[in-house]
Design a protein with these regions (language model features):
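Helical membrane-embedded segments and adjacent short helical loop/helix-boundary regions
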Residues: 6-22, 29-89, 94, 100-101, ...
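Short, contiguous, pocket-lining structural segments
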Residues: 16-20, 24, 43-46, 168, ...
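Transmembrane alpha-helical segments of multi-pass membrane transport proteins and ion-pumping complexes
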Residues: 18-31, 49, 53, 57, ...
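Juxtamembrane helix-boundary/capping and inter-helix hinge elements in multi-pass membrane proteins
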Residues: 37-38, 61, 88-100, 124-129, ...
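Hydrophobic alpha-helical transmembrane segments of integral membrane proteins
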Residues: 41, 45, 71, 76-78, ...
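Internal active-site segments that recognize and position negatively charged phosphoryl groups
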Residues: 90-167
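Alpha-helical membrane segments and immediately flanking helix-loop junctions
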Residues: 130-157, 161-164, 186-225
Length: 241
């Protein structure tokens, strides 16, 4: 038996498979992303997800088998989000001056994201629990799952909607901002980043951080505000209405 096949058989039967597959695929996707001058359509998260999902389907490996190893990377999502606070700390003077406008923008953006998703769900006559799963689509996936569970949605589906939303934001953000002629000076990067973090949570924030430090800092702020506001207001709104 060729050594590669022996290695594949060994890895696919152990938790090392998910960890190894995720790291290898992402490193290759990141290298391609760099070679393509960080083109939005070459987003490494998008192509990593598509490659791994296609590989699991082609090899008939179950998701629990894959996640047994990938969970070690999943654990790092929390520290990675917390690390976004450092660029914000470096810009604390700007935050003090604009906290009111930023909070209002976060409220408006979060409301628009949830309301538009619910309206589309009802317009297409989707099942009620699917519609509820759309409400937290612009919040990072673990939080979206918790919110969906509280309001009667499907947590796993909410996570899928959140990831897809983040990818769409990361892919389309630059083109939309350029079309709207959002400037690329310091205030413009702040606005771009805040919008990406509001609409695309962690995936959008990661894209913003790759492009500009100011954009990344304010995307991280928007991500945190959306987590806080959505966790409080979405369950409250469904309880009232």
């Amino acid at each position: 038996m060729p050594k590669f096949v022996e290695l594949w058989v060994y890895l696919s039967a152990t938790p090392l498979f998910g960890l190894t597959a995720t790291l290898v695929v992402y490193v290759l996707a990141q290298a391609a992303y760099a070679r393509l001058d960080q083109a939005p359509w070459a987003n490494p998260v998008l192509w990593s997800v598509l490659t791994i999902a296609g590989g699991l389907m082609a090899t008939d490996i179950s998701y629990p088998t894959y996640f047994a190893g990938a969970q070690f990377i999943h654990f790092l999502l929390g520290p990675a989000v917390v690390a976004l606070a450092w660029p914000l700390w470096e810009r604390r003077d700007v935050l003090r001056q604009r906290w009111g406008a930023l909070l209002l923008a976060a409220l408006a953006g979060g409301f628009a994201a949830s309301a538009s998703a619910l309206a589309l769900g009802w317009a297409f006559d989707l099942p009620h629990d699917v519609v509820l799963s759309l409400a937290p689509k612009s919040v990072t996936a673990p939080v979206a799952m918790g919110i969906a569970d509280k309001i009667g949605g499907i947590p796993a589906l909410a996570a899928v909607f959140a990831v897809v939303t983040g990818m769409v934001a990361a892919l389309s953000g630059k083109y939309l901002f350029d079309t709207l002629k959002v400037p690329t000076d310091a205030p413009g990067w702040m606005a771009r980043g805040f919008a990406l973090g509001t609409a695309g949570h962690g995936i959008g924030a990661a894209r913003a951080l790759q492009v500009n430090a100011n954009a990344g800092a304010f995307a991280g702020l928007a991500l945190g505000l959306q987590v806080l506001l959505a966790s409080l207001l979405i369950p409250l709104a469904f309880r009232i209405f």
